[in-house]
UniProtKB/Swiss-Prot annotation:
Protein name: Metal-staphylopine import system ATP-binding protein CntF
Cross-referenced Gene3D superfamilies: P-loop containing nucleotide triphosphate hydrolases (3.40.50.300)
GO annotation, cellular component aspect: plasma membrane
Gene name, Swiss-Prot/TrEMBL: cntF
Stimuli inducing this protein: Up-regulated in metal-poor media.
Family matches, as SMART domains: AAA
Record localization: Cell membrane
Pfam families linked to this entry: ABC_tran (PF00005)
Protein family membership: Belongs to the ABC transporter superfamily.
Membrane topology summary: Peripheral membrane protein
Entry EC no(s): 7.2.2.-
Superkingdom per UniProt: Bacteria
Amino acid sequence: MIKVTDVEKSYQSAHVFKRRRTPIVKGVSFECPIGATIAIIGESGSGKSTLSRMILGIEKPDKGCVTLNDLPMHKKKVRRHQIGAVFQDYTSSLHPFQTVREILFEVMCQCDGQPKEVMEVQAITLLEEVGLSKAYMDKYPNMLSGGEAQRVAIARAICINPKYILFDEAISSLDMSIQTQILDLLIHLRETRQLSYIFITHDIQAATYLCDQLIIFKNGKIEEQIPTSALHKSDNAYTRELIEKQLSF
C-alpha cells in the first residue's frame, strides 16, 4: 500500500526582499491500496505535480511522510521495482539521443542485467503489449508521434514489473481520440498486469473513465475524496464547479 500521511511542502520565495516560504502542499493524507485506481484532480497550480514528486520519492516532504508497505518512499531501494511513472512531457522524459531499444534496455539493465538477446525479446514483447511493432525498436523519440511516445513511456514504466504506476498529466497534450486509445490501453494493462494507478490530471472526464476513486485537489489540499460512481451526487461546491466546467450529466 502507498500511504500519504499529513504531507506538507513549501518552497523559498525567489524575491530578494521577501525570503519567506510559500506552502504548496498542505497536510495531505490518503491511501492507495493494491488494486486501487485513484485520480488526483486539480487545476493548474494546485500543487498536483509537487505532490506527485513526493509520492515518487523524488522530493522529501517538509512534514509528514509517504510510505510503500510502511517503508519510506524516498529510499531508492524501496521504490525501485515497485512504482513506475509516466509524465506529460515525453520529449524530456525519453532521452532524445537513445533509440527505443536503448531506452528500454537501460531500464532492464538496472533491474535484471539480462543478456542482450533476452532483453531484445523482452523489449519487443513490451512494445507489442502497448500496441507498437518491433519496427519501433530503432526509432528515436523525435521520430514518434505524441501517442507513440507515450506508449514507449508506458512500456518503460511496466518494464520493471511494478505494482503501481503514477501518471502525471500523461495524456493532457494528446488529441482527444489518442487520449481515449491510451486510456483503453491503461485499462487493459491494469487488468492483465494487476496494476494499481495514481492518475494525476486536471481532466475529470479522463479521471472518471479510468479511475474508481477521485481526490479533488484545490490549493494544495484535498477538497473531497469520493467514489467515481458518486461524483454526480457530490454537494461539495468546488467539485460541482469543476463538474460544471468539464462535464454535463
